[in-house]
């Protein structure tokens, strides 16, 4: 809990974790949208990235899409490979956790026609 005292957390999110990648909302939504389109569904995308839940393998993808959690670096590398993008290109859109807000996520979802994922 020392992180809360020292200011290294933003709403429970560590400011820096090398294994977690926070992407800007506008880029994150587009990236996941392309992944969903290529895979065919959010659950199929979850399976492509290695999520193995039998009930809802797309749950973690949804959490990342909505900005509730960061991309684990290993899953982001799989996403880059799946979409045929260089990981360096994706990492150029890395941001700090506090820059990922509900407002920026809602705006990005609306601009990309993903109203069905709108957070309430």
Identify the residue ranges that each predicted region occupies.
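Short alpha-helical "recognition helix" segments of helix-turn-helix
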Residues: 44-50, 79
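A short, Lys/Arg-rich alpha-helix, primarily the initiator
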Residues: 1-44, 88
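Short, basic-rich loop-to-helix N-cap that marks the start of a DNA-contacting helix
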Residues: 66-81, 97
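N-terminal positioning helix adjacent to the helix-turn-helix/winged-helix DNA-binding module
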Residues: 23, 27-28, 57-60, 75
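Core residues of bacterial helix-turn-helix
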Residues: 38, 49-54, 83
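Interfacial/linker helices and their anchor residues that mediate assembly or domain coupling
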Residues: 6, 98-120
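Recognition helix of helix-turn-helix/homeodomain-like DNA-binding domains
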Residues: 50-71, 93
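Residue-level signal for the short linker/turn that defines the boundary of a DNA-recognition helix
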Residues: 39-44, 56, 71-74
